Each structure stands twice: as structure tokens, then as C-alpha cells.
Amino acid sequence: LLLKGEGTAAFLHGQTTADIFAQKQLERIFLSCWLSTKGSLKALLEIRIFNNLAEIVIISGEINSIIDGFESVIFPADKVKLEVLKPIRRIQKINNYQSWKESTPVWISNSDLMENEIYDHTKLTKKELEIWKIRQGIPGFDREINGETNPYELGLGDIINLDKGCYLGQEAIARFFRSKALRYQLRCWEAYGEADNFD
């Protein structure tokens, strides 16, 4: 997705959990959550903002829901326009020793694709990718991201800025943070041995 216009930063600041104005100064890709009014996670986003443009990649979430959600609250006074871009390729080096949130992905437009940019990397199989996502605790759409869970329950509390001021879902997030009580918590565990030993 692409947001453009002089109100881009202010609009995203009010719709997501990141401090957009602080991130804009860094000119890098960063993570943010898009929440419901009750503080449940609707989508996990990567955002890169520069000048009056914001590129948005959906890590987990439903694109039409995000488009509808954004467009329903964009008013002429916001001075922002939403566009749907062609899909891109996202390259992320992965390992099991560092959080996926600490690594910097690379976005490549299919029209700018150079063969060596792809061939320098080994592509994971679908099974390897699923195992890595489980180990890393990356929430999946329609599983962990189900309209009921909040970012703290999904291990995403570190990408919520509690000092940034008003944003969608802020009041609910403040309550979750103060209560410290989680109904659920996303965890990963591994077991070794014969399958019969785990009955």
C-alpha cells in the first residue's frame, strides 16, 4: 500500500502504534500494529516513510480490511490518499538466534528485480518457513490474529509506543498495560524423543 500527501505522517500516527514522527526522521523500515478500537490486533505492518509518502507492507493481516479501514477514516482535511501498489518481493535473512524484529528486511519491486539479488539468498521451503515463524512467534492471520488477541498477548508489546499520544485502540492498550493480566500468551516449545513418549 502507498499513502501519499502532506498529512501522511499525521494520519498513520493516529492509526498505528508506532511513533511515526520519530520514525520518519530515521528513514528506515519499521514495524507497527494496526488495532481495533478495543485494542485487538488487526494487522502487523512494516512501514517506510519519507517526505510525504509512506510505503506499507502487510506482514500479517487482510489487505481489503486495511484498505476499507483506512479509507473509512480518511477525510479531505487529512490531506492523504491511499493507493494499492503491485506486490513486491521482501527479503529477510533469518536465523534462530536473533529476533526477526531486529533484522532489517529488503523490499524489491518486481520491476527492479536483479537476478543476483534473489540468487544470493537461499529460499526456504514452505515447511522451513512455517517452523521458523513458530520459533520466532510470528502471529498468523486467522490464527493468532483473530480479532480477539491484543499485541501483548502475541509478544508484540515492544512495538507499541506508549508515549506517543492518541491513536486507534490506545485506551484499550493502556488498560492492558496497566493490568498486566494476559488471557493468553503466545509461546513456543520443542520436544525431543520418540512421538510415543508424548502421549
Each predicted region: which residue ranges?
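Basic, glycine/lysine-rich polyanion-binding surfaces/domains
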Residues: 1-199
